[in-house]
Amino acid sequence: MWKGFLCCLLVAGVTSLQEWDPNRQYVYKVESRAFTALHQISNQYAGILMRAKLIIQPKTREELHAQLVEVEHSQINKELPSGWDQEIEIHDWQQLSALKDAFAIILQNGHIVNVKVKDSTPNWAVNILKGILSTLQVNTQADNLVRHRYNILPNASTDSAVYSIRETTITGECEVEYDVSPLPALPLLQHPELAPLSNVNDNVIDIEKTQNFSNCKRRPAVHYGLAGIPDLEPGQNQMGDFLARSSVSRVVISGTLNKFTVQSSVTTNQVVMSPEMYNSQKGLIVSRVNVTIKDIEEARPIPLPGNLQDTGDLLYSYNNAHDIEPLQRDRQDSDFTLESDSSSSSSSSSSDENSWSRDSHSRISEENKKAQIKQQRIKANRHSDDDVTNDEISFASRERQRRSRTRRSIRNDDSSSSSSSSEEDYQPRPLRGQPPNIPLLPFFVGNRGNAAFLLSSDDPAEIVKSLAEEIKSDMKKPAYIPERSTHAKLMMMRDIVRTMTAKQLQKATSLIHSESKHDLGWIAYRDMVSESGTHPALEELSIWIISKKLSSEEGAELLATLPRAVIMPTPEYFEAFNKLVMDKRVRNQPIVNSTGLLALATLHRQVHDAEFSHNNYPVHAFGRMVPRNYNATNDFIDYLGKQLHAAMADGNRPKIQVIIRALGNTGNKRILNYLEPYLERKKNATEFERLLMVTSLDILAEINPELARQVLYNVYINIGENHELRCASVILLMRTQPPAAMLQRMAEFSNIDPVKQVVSAVQSAIRSAANLKEPGNLNLARAARSAVNILNPMSMDIAYSNDILSSNMIQDMDLGYKDNMAHVGSSDSIIPNTILRKFNRYAGGQAHSDINFSEMVSSVKQLLKALRNPLKQREDPLLRREPVADRREFNIPPIIIDIAPPLEGNMMLRWLGNDRFFSYDKNDIKQLFRNYNAAALPLADMHMLDDMKVYNQKSLAIAFPNALGLPSLFTIDVPTVLRANSTFRLLLNNTSSESSSIEVLPWKLGARSETSLTYSVKEMSKIAIVTPFNSMEHMAALERNILINIPIKLDVDFDLEAQNIALNMKLIGKDSNPRLAQLSTNTYTTNHKITIIKPAIQDEEANEIHVRPARMMRDTFGKLQTGIALNLEIETEDEFLDMEFVRQELQGRDFTSALAFIWARRTINNHNVTLSIDEDQSTTNAVRIEGKYASKINDVDAGTWTEWRSSRVERSAKRHHRPRPEAQEYDSSANPAIVDRADKLEEFLNRASGNRVHGLAVRVAFTGSSDATFDLTAALGLSNVNGSARALVSYISQPAHPADVMPRKTEYDLFAALSMPAPPIINFNQALEFDPDSNLDAGLSIFTNDKPSGNLRIKGELQQSEERRNAIRSTPAALACMREMANGNNNLLPSCRNATEMANRLDRIRLQAKFENLSDDLINNTYKAYTWIRYFTQPYVTENIAQEQNPGRLNINVDVNNDGTALNASVDTALMSITWTNIRLNRWTRSLVEPSPQDTALDRLAREALPLYYEPTCVLDVSQAATFDNTTYPLTLSSAWHMMLQYQPKRSQDDENLDDVPDIIRPPVAILARETSNRRKEILMNLDHTIVAFKPTSEVNVEVNGRILIIEQSRTTDIMAEGNLVLQIHRLPSRAVYMVAPQHKLLMIHDGKRVLLQASNGYRDEVRGLCGTFDGEPTTDFTTPSNCILNDPKAFINSYRLGGDREDNAWMLNYRAQPCVSRNFTSTDIIGKHMPRNPASRGFELPHPVNDTSSSSSSSSESSSSSSSSSSESASNSDLHNNSTSSSSSSSSSSSESAEGAPEKSSRKTSPPQTSTLHRTMVVEEVTEICFSMRPLPECAPRFKPADTLKKKIKFHCLTKGPTASHWLKMVKKGVNPDFSKKREHKQLEVDIPAKCVRH
């Protein structure tokens, strides 16, 4: 039955042919068009139309003869109002004679399988023929069926069907969906062109064909630069969110599905894309081929040429760019074949293989004949033989030889492979020194199918030289770069360089290279060679570097470009790159060598990252870039690994960092083999190097997140690891998209993790990840939300480690970003020692990494010390005198010196489009300053700098053939130019009296320069169609420009000692009205000639695309203020240009996305915004800025405030002799032009009385024909004894004015006095009872030309409401404080300090203002400001209009609610009342609107950011103490002195004399405490030989160096030493002593029983004592002088006891009895090992069996299962340890040892598995000690005995007999195996080890 059915199908297949009558010929009319446009902006199209007649004469059933006649073409560039398919009247048709020759069509089962053409027919013509014939490819019988459930197969009885088949057309061998249905007569009547030769009674069938590009076996396309788009298949129906592609054919046939005639066939191919990948307005490439039958005539012979050649099926064939010989496409070695290609192909037949072999042989044997044809073809192209260089001819010859060798190799090596000939046809891979043969791109196919200048008389080297000269000329006027299309010229240069051979590049170099480093033409050529990314370019770059044509920095910059720019990283490319990096001459240039290593490592990663390589390189045209098993990458990693070990041995720290980063850049799992011994502490490395190893796993985390996640999690979970490594692991772990279960484990662990740095990192990471919005991170966001409520709720200081993830999506624009900002907190500084930043932008579904920054340093404090003065010999703090200088003697405990880590650091950043990495150590910093010192004197002479950098921020291209067989392409380039042209000299005074030393910052610095800085970027988006026969590129383009141009003359004088700065600036340049900035957009269509080197936008045919008539707006500003007239010109086609337009454009954007997508617009249209200087209207041309800062410390008491006000009024009145309002408290001067600004600042400092006064004077003067001056003088006085502050501000404005107009001078004099009491700050109860209400008094006087013109007086009260006070009592902090006070009279613990601070905050503000004679301008500006406030607070504001009353008065009331979460405000004016209700407050705004007499607004903001470490505080309260790191413990002090704080500076490993440093030191700063009667505390301080004693009696008395001080509440007592302020002391209202030591940055409050000490963060990690270690971790606070960490607070206190009663040794016994726990880090297995799954084989003891029978059975089964599990485990972990061997099974049971009397199945159920061998710690008891084996040893399990033994020497750890040894002995007997592996080895003993165990 089945045989009969198959026979029927075969008969049907044979007869299912188009009804070709051999006696007739068929005449078809061919009409085709291909257009490109930004069609959703405007119906303006550019493109080509073609028409012809196709005559087909059948010869046999398998062969047709055909000819195209009357072939004509025409191009258009105009608007088509009705769209691309409207009828177009064309008058200038041109002949296309290359298509006139007859050809043959070979059929197989009715399908076109080959087209034979004349051998001289160019390849582009063949593709056009195939495009026309593709419309006639019809499969009505469902051959090559693609199985689908919805298929309805055709049959002879019906004319309808739905099915999918695989079919070959010009655009690919793809799945094609057929929809077949009868076509009724009515549509034919309406559209007779569908079937012109059909009759009314004919059976007409309509066939709709839809090509599915997402399911293709062969798909001609080329692409690059598409990395970052997940799940992309270039050329498919949809690519990302930016491009969609479709191809639909409508075929109308008459007859039946068995025999039919094609009446008409129309194929329409459309590509719709976003020009910038994100736009809602799209662009279009459309092509259509319409073949309609015109006549069926009597057959007339169509003579075929005699020299026909096969061109294959209808698939588009690639051109040969570098040879006029038709391209013979290679079938690549299977190692280069894409997996998708080989997997989708079927096995080849032997006949195909033989045919391939014959073709190869025949091509080789006809070389001479083809050489003759080549000569003829050159003449046919109207070029002589001389036009083809010898280099090109030799290249073609070598290419043919290579093809022959390749084919022979494949035929011989792969003849047995079923897939050898089924792989995709690929372009030939470029030979060494030859450019790639990239298909479909204009400069490779634009000249009659060849490279643009292959057949041209123009030499590419000469053309490149000409472009370099043009660019050089353009750069002379950088402000006009956009108009001159310099960026387009740069891209043309790059494209031409891509087509050039190595010899051509060498010639171009000889023509362009200049010995001058400032030749801009050479610089442009230099950068474009690196941007071209070809093998010849790399060879040329290598020559430049080795021959030192480039400086080291230039060479490094170009090498860093290569991973981004390379277009085909083939094995030959890697070989050349590797040869360059390994060259000795390059290794002698460290910066070049290190950058080259990093770039090469990055390139290895990019090629081996399957998704990146597939999307970024033209793999569908060339196959894989490197073979599947490319050993060069492994060899490179092995080389880096060896270099790492060697550098570790040499101690070359910068080199170590470079190698670690290079290993990380590879992103290969094999790097773990080299990092593992260091990460697991099996080999020595510094903690910083281990940290760098972890952060270098960032690439691995992206490429292999599962593997990286396992490693990073193992680092994180080890609480014995360094916190920096653990935090870095958390940061990278979040980049691996961890699942919800893992995040929940981390969140739960944060509740028990003892390290706060790590807890903070986990908290911030999970909380921020829960708010991610970017679609690619929705799974992470969901997982984080599942864990966020499990987190430790503790609030963390931002000084701790943080990992902040944020994202945003602008949905309607398909734009977004993901930002990861993280830092790892430092233990020795508030500044983080590691900062990581990764910022990705998303556009159209493509992710692009814009920022990849990291900054790491081993020790922030060590770095700051090195930067202060690396060469100057500083006083060694160890040489200072002993700290206690009075007559007492104390036994100060010796403190073991902590050794600071060696200074190491690095920075990685993306600079000028490239990733750069800089590493350093202390020697590098010293060398940096030596170089600075050496360069200081030469820089005093005038120097010239004229440099430029050109780079391409983004390069993207995708191209494929359209329905006409012509290349269609979409490209984006973003060329960027950064130019600096400067002449400068530096005037330095940086040497001290000692000629051998320098200062980091000179005391005086001067600079004189004339500089022109230019930044110009152009985004170039192009949608184009290439017609190779006339070298035209029909395009629609979008270009956006950003230009910033600053030509300026700058003189700077800086005096550090006098704190003065002066700047003189003047715009320079030869251009009139110099342009400063420009932002523009241009859209246009054009038909561009490829071989004419000219920017497309400059074509005569270039037509701008206009949406609507442009509007011009021009405004000049600044003329009346500064005298410099700035012109703002706006030309735009936007419909609206107002605030609503701005709001709509910013809709959906947060601040980050607004900056990241600054030029992204929702609509596309032409606009131009230009900012320039109008020199004709400007009256000034230079500006001088002068600034001076001054400060003063006064001895002022509280009563001075009244005296200051009254005396000030008198002095003001006497000096001015003019009437002033009573509110005016300050008069600037009668003649400001005479009084020097320095004198005025000094006067302000004297009048703004306070303990601390800060002053600032700034003057901005514009000079020219009419001067303009603006003077600001301000002073702020602050009190040390209360919260009062006083401010004076004077602002004098004298704008520019015409010569015939009197100058107008306006003066604003402001005074403000805030009077605040001194509140209780160490007693919460007193704070609740205290009245903190404060007063504000302020006034503003305005003078115009020295005459009063208005004044304003404000009086106000700042209050605390009774409701707020009552609410504070019930807050958690207040309740906790009350409990602490009740339990131990403790007032200074953290909860009480927080409660006291809340009790001093004010929640009510009442202001009354009176004003008169204010100018209308000031009133109008005030109202405008109010309208802005009203706009942004619209939901909260209400207005009530009232009758005018109380004119000249204004009342402002502000009330904050009790929780500080919202405020109400009201403003009452004469005309209206305005009310704001429930304006929400966050913690930052709350700090601003709730003033407090205890601190300033800046203090409150800083405390919100750094609640723990803004003012690090240590407290000794009555019965409890709190450390700097917030550890609270019970406190009991004896009468002996205890060390409260001891400054303990670390010694650096970099110090040369480290070996000479003693193990203990006596520090220069120490604070001692002891208890006297009534739990009072006496304090003794040593501050660099200044001894301060605090002695509590009835009140605390203070002695300084034995002298008793008189301390008052109303003023400070200042202690000076050597002209420096050492101490400031005063009493608080509670009579407690308040002391500040500004030089030592210490603050202390002492009330007799309690001591509060605040120290700056400069003491971090360098103190010891009762205040803890101050390293950020409470777990280390109880560190003793011997660096042991205790758990008992009493023992900890005793460890810092300084002696006392010699008879009382109980405290010492208590201290010594405590176990010493060191701060050493522990290591764990970070990277999984090959371990057997059997627990017993891993050293665990399993439960004993119940009976012998089950034991025997389980032993047998376990033996086999252990072996299999071991092997499977080995396989599962093979990606972690490729070079490791799996552990063998420890089971020695044979398979014959099975159970007796019980079935195997039941034994598995009743007994657990058992092994014959166990691992246990061996114990050897001796006379005085017990010894334990350091590792568990094998021994026979119960019921087993040794069959044989071996003697081995085993390491033992021994303990003296006693409690400890007995404890461990008991544990071993219980079956526990203690870990003695890290203990000290005491002896080796020879013991018997069982070799095999057998049953008893």
From Swiss-Prot:
Residues covered by the Vitellogenin domain: 20-835
GO MF entries: lipid transporter activity; nutrient reservoir activity
Residue intervals of the VWFD domain: 1512-1705
Cleavable signal peptide: 1-16
Major location category of this protein: secreted
Region entry Disordered, spans: 325-437, 1209-1231, 1727-1816
Glycosylated residues in this chain: 155, 212, 290, 593, 631, 684, 852, 981, 989-990, 1168, 1282, 1394, 1413, 1420, 1464, 1526, 1720, 1747, 1778-1779
Compositionally biased region (Polar residues): 1805-1815
Biased composition (Basic residues): 400-409
Gene3D superfamilies the UniProt entry points to: Lipovitellin, beta-sheet shell regions, chain A, Lipovitellin-phosvitin complex, chain A, domain 4, Vitellinogen, superhelical
Biased composition (Basic and acidic residues): 325-334, 355-370
SS bond partners: C1514-C1667
Subcellular localization: Secreted
GO cellular-component term (any): extracellular region
SMART domains assigned to the protein according to its UniProt record, in alphabetical order: DUF1943, LPD_N, VWD
Segments of skewed composition (Low complexity): 335-354, 1750-1794
Residue ranges of coiled coil: none
Function as written in the Swiss-Prot or TrEMBL entry: Precursor of the egg-yolk proteins that are sources of nutrients during embryonic development.
Protein's UniProt name: Vitellogenin-1
Species of provenance: Periplaneta americana
Lineage of origin: Eukaryota, Metazoa, Ecdysozoa, Arthropoda, Hexapoda
Gene behind this protein: VG2
